[in-house]
UniProtKB/Swiss-Prot annotation:
Its EC number is 2.7.1.21. PANTHER family: THYMIDINE KINASE (PTHR11441), THYMIDINE KINASE, CYTOSOLIC (PTHR11441:SF0). Substrate binds at Y114, I158, E159, L160, I161, G162. ATP binds at G11, P12, M13, F14, S15, G16, K17, S18. It comes from the Viruses. One of its GO terms (biological process) is DNA biosynthetic process. The active site is at E84. Belongs to the thymidine kinase family. This is Thymidine kinase. Coiled coil: none annotated. Keywords: ATP-binding, DNA synthesis, Kinase, Metal-binding, Nucleotide-binding, Transferase, Zinc. It catalyses: thymidine + ATP = dTMP + ADP + H(+). Zn(2+) binds at C139, C142, C171, C174. The gene is TK.
Length: 177
């Protein structure tokens, strides 16, 4: 049995996680691998049939809120890309299952909430990943490297999907002010 591997791409809002996911999947597509990208069904800001970056670059995708619900559609797939991995409750078990089937899994996800706490169980994927990439954004206040996402509203729910109208990428100093 050939084993696949897991590549986890982490970072705050606006750090280029989805852009990197799209870039990596496109490389595999050029090399004629059969690829499938999965997106979180509740993130429909730009549409339901593709993963979009904030600057409207996109790649075709299937939407779901449970990864295992679509596992049977992946038999002929070599590469599985997952965007917004932090929102999937079954992300850890699914990625391990798919990688153990010999497939390459690339996951883009926020590592922390707007409160700088672990987002869902995404950090539990780190010990199972062969490669972990941590991206930084640019602080939208002082323009230094930004490692955190700061919410602009007083809404308290963890799952609040949005872009620049709801979040800033910030450095430590600007997060605390």
């Amino acid at each position: 049995m050939s084993c696949g591997f897991i590549h986890l791409i982490l970072g705050p809002m606006f750090s280029g996680k989805s852009t990197e996911l799209i870039r990596l999947v496109n490389r595999y597509q050029i090399a004629t691998y059969n690829c499938r990208v999965i997106k979180y069904s509740k993130d429909n800001r730009y549409g339901n049939d593709a993963v979009y970056t904030h600057d409207k670059c996109y790649i075709s995708a299937v939407s779901t809120d449970s990864l295992f619900d679509i596992k049977d559609t992946l038999d002929d797939v070599d590469i599985v890309g997952i965007d917004e991995g932090q929102f999937f409750n079954d992300i850890v078990e699914f990625c391990e299952y798919i990688a153990n089937k010999g497939k390459i899994v690339i996951v883009a996800a926020l590592d922390g909430t707007y409160e700088r706490k672990p987002f869902g169980n995404i950090l539990n994927l780190i010990p199972l990943s062969e490669k972990v990439t941590k991206l930084n954004a640019i602080c939208m206040i002082c323009h230094r490297d930004a490692s955190f996402s700061k919410r602009l509203s007083d809404e308290k729910e963890i799952e609040l999907i949005g872009g620049k109208e709801k979040y800033l990428s910030v450095c430590r100093s600007c997060y605390l002010t």
